[in-house]
């Protein structure tokens, strides 16, 4: 309970600090953009893995499995160019380290995507060119080891309560119906691929492999017809909802995407009160990262985030001095980003409303909330063990007492029966 009270007090302190700052802040001349957070998926890549009967194994791909392709590099360079145009006048036209901070998961494809993106966002100008023949400059991308990443690599674990929720999700009518409807289809796919452990939760790997091969001009096997690919795609999208929704979505969010959302909320609050962060904060990650965050925000469209798709948070200071948050999702390269509205708030969402509406899906103490609560059955077991332990303890004490008394009798002493002759 102490951890919970301290969590609520921190949230209340953020609200109080923000409110006090807004009361004393003088009005600005015009509405202005103050801070941007980007979360994007890596670009086009090779398959993460293959299946036993696949004629195309790892050697088919120049850099092996799970690696960014030239197409993926171009996708992120183009996204960087689009961001450069969108934030012209907000960001300096040349790279300034005080303005930008980039963090990536520790995967080759996300690190390289961030580097390609920065090449499009900040081509070197003038003195920044270290070679006149190279229109590129090194810009730092920060990361942590995969095993230590508690911000961008989802699903987060180990988390016993989340695993319990997943087991409960498997018992829901929606999951059970989906499983029964696709039982024969999964058997067919398992037979064609040579996979022995194919389930609703793992079939996305088959779709991913076939999709990557098709994208790169490789011929698919006859069984992978357009109808089969469409069905696999739908099951792939179902697997994302299984991870972060279907059942107890809000609690799953607290254990998953809400962790990242908590950091984004802190950054927005900090920039509205002290302006002590870079103007642009970038996260380079995965489709699961985007889905986890968008499910926590309740703005997920139910489909896998495309390569180089980008979720945008923009913090504005209004002419009144108050702050607002706008969200966008760029999931098509040839169109402007789609406006996203947090449920219960207009697209131009006042910052305090944004914080209030997202509070329920932000964990107060992730480690504590991940623990399993003791139910009635657990209590009965504990009581029974305690009773048995007490009885065993008393028996041991009684036995030791008897043994002690027997050993305490003097040598040669024996009881004399009535009527026995004395020597």
UniProtKB/Swiss-Prot annotation:
User: Would I find Membrane among this entry's keywords?
Assistant: yes
List all topological domains (Lumenal).
Answer: 31-380
Q: Where are the transmembrane segments?
A: 381-401
Q: Which GO terms describe its cellular component?
A: lysosomal lumen; lysosomal membrane
Q: What class of enzyme is it?
A: hydrolase
Q: Does the keyword Transmembrane helix apply?
A: yes
Q: Which SUPFAM superfamilies match?
A: Phosphoglycerate mutase-like (SSF53254)
Sorted alphabetically, the Gene Ontology BP terms of this entry are: lysosome organization
Q: Which UniProt keywords apply?
A: Disulfide bond, Glycoprotein, Hydrolase, Lysosome, Membrane, Signal, Transmembrane, Transmembrane helix
Q: Which residues form the active site?
A: 42, 287
PROSITE patterns xref list = HIS_ACID_PHOSPHAT_1 (PS00616), HIS_ACID_PHOSPHAT_2 (PS00778)
Leader sequence range is 1-30
Hey, which stretches end up on the Cytoplasmic side?
402-423
Which cysteines are disulphide-bonded? 159-370, 212-310, 345-349
Tell me what PTMs the record reports for this protein.
Answer: The membrane-bound form is converted to the soluble form by sequential proteolytic processing. First, the C-terminal cytoplasmic tail is removed. Cleavage by a lysosomal protease releases the soluble form in the lysosome lumen.
User: Where are glycans found on this sequence?
Assistant: 92, 133, 167, 177, 191, 267, 322, 331
**Which InterPro entries has this protein been placed in?**
Acid_Pase_AS, His_Pase_clade-2, His_PPase_superfam, Histidine_acid_phosphatase
The way it spans or sits in the membrane comes to: Single-pass membrane protein
Location in the cell reads:
Lysosome membrane; Lysosome lumen
Instruction: List the catalysed reactions.
Output: a phosphate monoester + H2O = an alcohol + phosphate
Q: What is its EC number?
A: 3.1.3.2
According to the UniProt entry, its GO molecular function terms are: acid phosphatase activity
According to its UniProt record, which protein family does this protein belong to? Belongs to the histidine acid phosphatase family.
Output this protein's name. Lysosomal acid phosphatase
